[in-house]
Structure formats: C-alpha cells, structure tokens
Amino acid sequence: MPVRKIRRPSRPQELSAAYMKALDLHMAEFRAGTADRAWGIRDFAERLFVHPTHLSNTLQEVTGRSPCDIYEERLMDVARELLIGSKGSAAEVARQLTMDPSNFNKFFKRFEGITPKQFRELRAMRHSA
C-alpha cells in the first residue's frame, strides 16, 4: 500500500490562520468588554512576529481581502451580537467596542445601511410579529 503524504498548509496559509485566530481572540475581548482598544495591523503583525506589510500582503494573497476588511466584518458581527444580546444603549455598545458613539453610528450605518437604533427597532418588529 503506497504511503500517502500529509499535506501541510503553506506558510502563507499558516500565517493567515494565525491572524484569524488572533482576530478571534481580540473579538472575544470585545464581547467580554475587556478590550482596551482596537488593534491595528501593526498590533497583529507584532503578535505574529512578522512585518505589517508582509502580513497584509499575505492575507490579501490567501483570502483575497485586506486585513482591514476582515477586521471590520468581524467587528460588525460582534456589534450586531451586542446590539441583539444586550439591553445597553448603542452608545454603551460603542464604548464596549472602544469606539466613539457617533463614529460607531457611522461605521454601523456604512455596513448595515441603517443606524444601530434602527437595527434594534427592526429586529424587535420582526420578533414581535
């Protein structure tokens, strides 16, 4: 019986997976309310012991997306979760995400097309019907 070689992920795939894992941990800090600030590409690169440009280029190559796009998408997922799962105001959710409330409203609206308040109202209407 021939011996099958186990394919190891390439270094770019490993780096991309390590970024996603670090990103998941950072998003968990937001969910728990323990994040003191939002991380940038330099923060992730430092934790992964690579240059920020190398990390950015590798993520673009492997995923077809920039680290910023990936980060913002994940942050929006957390924002939606917090708006749905908490009774706190949108301003409190913004602060938990280490954002200024007015910037959070703009950020949220850019992705969802509606404000956090409208998002909650729409969600409440759907679940009461």
Predicted regions and their residues:
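Active-site beta-alpha loop architecture of Rossmann-like, nucleotide-cofactor-dependent enzymes
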Residues: 111
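Alpha-helical bundle regulatory/interaction domains
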Residues: 1-53, 60-62, 66, 71, ...
